[in-house]
Amino acid sequence: MLWWRSPLRFRLTRYRAYNLPIDSPGFYLYIRHPDGTVWSPTFRPVETVLDEWSACHQPGRTVFVAEKVGVRVKLTFFIPPGTDALVWDVRLENSAGKAQELDLFAYAEFSQFEWEQELRGGYYTRHMMKTWMCREANALVYLDHDAKPYFALKPTVYFLSSDEIHSYSGDRDDFIGNYRHENAPQSVLAGRCNDSALATGHPCGALHNKVVVPAGGHYRLHYCLGVVTGCNGSIEDAETGVVKATANLRSAGWPDGSLEVLEAWWSDHFSAYQCAVPDPVAMRQINTWNPVNTVTAARFSRGINTWAPGTRGVGFRDTAQDMVAIAYRSPGWAIEGMRYLLSQQFEEGHTVHTCFPEDFRPSSRSDRSDNHLWLAPLLWAILAETRDFGILDETIPYLAPDCSGKGTEATVWEHMCAAVRFTENHLGRHGLPLTLRSDWNDLIGKFNKRGEGETVFAGFQHVLALKRLAEIARHTGRTEDLRWFEECRARQEAALLSHAWDGSWWRRGYDDDGNPVGSVNSKGGNLFLNPQSWAILAGVGTREQQFAGMDAVAEQLDIGYGLKLLHPPFGGWDSDAETLIGYGPGCGENGAVFCHANTWAIIAEATLGNGTRAWKYHNQLIPRNVIERLGAETYRAEPNAWVSNIVGPGNPRMGWGNVEHVTGTAAWMDIAATQYLLGVRAELDGLWVDPCLPTKWNAINVRRKYLGCKVDIEILNPEGVEKGVVEASAGGSAVNVTEGKAVFAPELFEGVGELRIMVRMGRL
């Protein structure tokens, strides 16, 4: 599927989610030989048996390599930065002893732009579409002339070839033919399209090229499927815009140059943090696929993937968490993300739940106990990386109460204080935050039907937010706010210590009647994962309590390919007592391996110094490792992308991975690995090196950018300890070590191009 700006408003190509086959329609290249043999380098849709086939996903591109009867094709798809076009780079090799004459057909089915409108009324709006061939641009043009309030923004689609186009079709039904589908289009079988433009119906782009690949030789061409804007429904303006936008795109060397731009972008993004560790699978995940996944999630929030249809917009808490992982690689991007999120906060301190910056619809108001609590950790992460405390005084308007526009102006710091006030004004009978609609666990709101339920998870979040803000206040001399934060934190910690500890683990909360949730006597869901990890993230409780909670997790929730969200799952649907109705046992929030929540357990174990357990939890969820353990046919998700959850025990689909790419797992797995397992992270007082390693690792290396300095960090572990730094130096000069951590002051890096750091771990 391809879209411009919004997959809801400006969807360019069709994708039929949930239908079989699940990956259709796609971007198809048909290769036809003179004898009528037809095949595709992507295998689908033709499904002709190939002599050789491979697919390789790389950062920013996908490469298919296939061979049939002496013709080898390398097909690369990518979108260059700064270009609103999907490039199809086609390279052909001929290993036969004679020249090969081939017909190539590039095909994509177009959408009607507005996906929801297409579902509701596409049988009318199909009369408002037009396709035609623009010979000057050597491109097929697709124009939607359905008038809308944002008509001027609607793009014009073009589909061009770098080679002469011998025939074309802009009409799907004409290209495919009656009673057929994409595996055998009548135009491909006939060896020619009908040069059919579209005045009404179902649009597509189909371009036909005739090529001759010499014996032992090569041939190369490319296609671009892209958009131009500002055409205002005019055919003349559309043609002018397409000709101008594509002037350089047809040149033979253009794909190479644009691919270099793409590679440079990813190289710069990766260079912010790279590691060398003894585990090659973990190293590849940390160095390559974690940052790729975090970019995807930060760009698209939870709105769109092969299952999500694009209607969810931008989740507030989702994007706030995604931006924490972006902050140390691209702080400017994270700052812009935070500014937008603050514009979606109400003056009372709470926030919207979902917003739609590109979809021309109002934000979705839904009072939850956690959304606003993700702001403080994001701000803290940005300040730790940039030390730009001037951000605190920037003014950003609140959102109007009816979500229709801007409210009163406030500084970033005032936004943070408003978030604290909202939680302080919404505490329950035990002094814990009221659950409201829900907290991070959406279904926990079912324990709160009358509005009197309380959440321990949000209580721990509140403590962490207060600690982060207190640190910032201390650094910036805001003494009155510091005193207030400390008072709020002390009260919340006291409430948690008095009412959240169940004897062997931390409770999940309280229902409307004041009954504990996540207690040893609960009906289902006796033990929840999140309170155990977040007690440690927030620094609440004694060491004995923290260890006990995580030991309970290891004993009851670890199933070898992840930690279940709770145990035992709720099992019935016929009474209010079975609160998590809807999800079957082992699914979603009812006992699945919720990978996002696993990340906090990894951080918790690393904080406690349990390196063996922390790395076990990390490595057992790496997609490649899950596939090796369970099998690809069971897991059914990509080997290069984190998933949201994996179906747990008690369900016949146990091991099935769900919701890949657009998940909070990506950001937090990246944070867990780089900042807590490898232990190199920015804090307000400098760069910390605080690794937590497996005992068999004797040395690792981390290369990181900090305050404009390229830092090379050698971490030695000659005694095979899990945690604890005993010696450190920067540029050959000793640095003090405190409580097993090496803290390198910001002054060491400012104005320095490169700095080498050495850290030695040992027994404290």
Predicted stretch roles:
Residues 100, 211-229, 462-465, 755-757:
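Short Pro-Gly-centered flexible turn/kink motifs
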Residues 257-309, 336, 340, 422, ...:
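Low-complexity, Ser/Thr/Pro/Gly-enriched N-terminal "stalk/linker" regions
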Residues 64, 78-186, 237-267, 271-272, ...:
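Polysaccharide-binding surfaces and accessory modules of carbohydrate-active proteins
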Residues 105-107, 118, 352-353, 461-578, ...:
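Catalytic cores of carbohydrate-active enzymes
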Residues 1-67, 143-189, 258-278, 668, ...:
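An extended acidic
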Residues 8-71, 555-556, 587-590, 603-764:
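Non-catalytic C-terminal accessory modules of carbohydrate-active enzymes
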Residues 314, 318-319, 323-431, 455-463, ...:
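Aromatic-rich carbohydrate-recognition surfaces in CAZymes
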Residues 305-313, 353-371, 398-407, 432-454, ...:
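Carbohydrate-binding/catalytic loop surfaces
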